[in-house]
C-alpha cells in the first residue's frame, strides 16, 4: 500500500470513529426504534430478495459500521459476524447487540486483514452493501478476504452503486449531469466533510479519501480469487 493510501485509510478510520456516535443518535438510523421493536425495521425488499433465506446460515457482514444491518440479519435467523475497522463502530455494535439481545459477534479489523483476525473461519454467506467499495484502496486483498471466508458452496452478495454513479458532480443543482470525477482511478480523491450523510448538522469536520474502482476491477478481483458469477 502506498503512503497516500495508508494516510487515506487512517483518515477514513478517524472519520468513521467521529461519525459513529452521531449516527447512533440520528433519526436516519432510528436506533431507539430498532431497540424498542427490532421486527419493525426489517431489511428492504431488494435486500431480502438478493440475500434470500439466511435462517441458520453462518453469515459474515463486511464493513458493518455499528452493526444495525448485521443485527437485522441476526433477527432473520443468521448466525452473524460483523466486521469493521472503526473501534467506535464496533463498540457501539456490541452495545446494540446487548440492548436488543440479538446474538452476534463483532470483530474490529480492516477487512483486508481479516484472514489474520479470524483464521480458518468459514461462512455460508459473505455480505457487504451500500457505499463500501470506494473506501478501499485496493480490491485485491478485499477479494482475497471474501474468498478465504467462504465455506465450500458459500455465496458472496455485494450491493453497491455502479461505478459510473460516482463520476458525476454531486453538488450540481440543475441539469444536465456533468462529469466531475474520474472513472478510472489513479490514487484517492480527498474531501473535507462537514457533518455526515446521516447527521448533516453534526458539529464534526473530517477528511475522507475515496478510491474509484471500475466495474471490471470489482468483478475481476473476485474472479481472480476463484469466485464465479451465478
Tell me the role of every PLM-derived stretch:
Residues 1-55, 68, 72, 155-196:
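Conserved class I S-adenosyl-L-methionine
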Residues 57-114:
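Class I SAM-dependent methyltransferase SAM/SAH-binding core
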Residues 116-126:
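A short acidic, Gly/Pro-enriched loop at the edge of an enzyme's catalytic core
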Residues 124-140:
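A short SAM/SAH-binding and catalytic strip from SAM-dependent methyltransferases
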Residues 140-155:
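A short glycine-rich, Lys/Arg-flanked "PGG" loop and its adjoining helix->strand segment in the class I
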Residues 208-230:
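Short alpha-helix
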Amino acid at each position: 500500500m502506498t503512503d497516500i493510501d495508508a494516510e487515506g485509510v487512517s483518515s477514513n478510520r478517524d472519520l468513521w470513529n467521529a461519525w459513529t456516535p452521531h449516527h447512533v443518535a440520528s433519526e436516519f438510523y432510528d436506533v431507539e426504534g430498532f431497540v424498542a421493536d427490532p421486527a419493525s425495521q426489517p431489511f428492504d425488499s431488494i435486500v431480502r430478495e438478493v440475500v434470500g433465506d439466511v435462517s441458520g446460515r453462518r453469515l459474515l457482514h463486511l464493513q458493518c459500521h455499528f452493526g444495525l444491518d448485521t443485527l437485522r440479519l441476526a433477527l432473520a435467523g443468521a448466525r452473524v459476524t460483523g466486521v469493521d475497522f472503526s473501534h467506535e463502530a464496533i463498540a457501539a455494535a456490541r452495545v446494540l447487540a446487548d440492548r436488543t439481545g440479538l446474538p452476534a459477534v463483532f470483530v474490529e479489523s480492516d477487512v483486508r486483514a481479516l484472514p489474520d483476525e479470524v483464521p480458518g473461519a468459514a461462512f455460508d454467506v459473505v455480505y457487504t452493501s451500500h457505499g463500501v467499495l470506494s473506501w478501499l484502496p485496493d480490491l485485491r486483498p478485499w477479494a482475497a478476504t471474501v474468498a478465504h471466508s467462504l465455506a465450500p458452496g458459500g455465496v458472496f452478495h455485494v450491493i453497491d452503486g455502479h461505478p459510473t454513479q460516482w463520476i458525476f458532480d454531486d453538488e450540481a443543482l440543475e441539469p444536465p449531469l456533468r462529469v466531475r470525477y474520474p472513472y478510472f482511478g489513479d490514487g484517492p480523491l480527498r474531501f473535507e466533510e462537514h457533518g455526515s450523510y446521516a447527521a448533516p448538522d453534526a458539529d464534526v469536520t473530517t477528511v475522507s479519501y475515496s478510491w474509484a474502482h471500475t466495474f471490471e476491477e470489482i468483478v475481476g478481483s473476485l474472479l481472480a480469487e476463484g469466485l464465479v458469477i451465478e
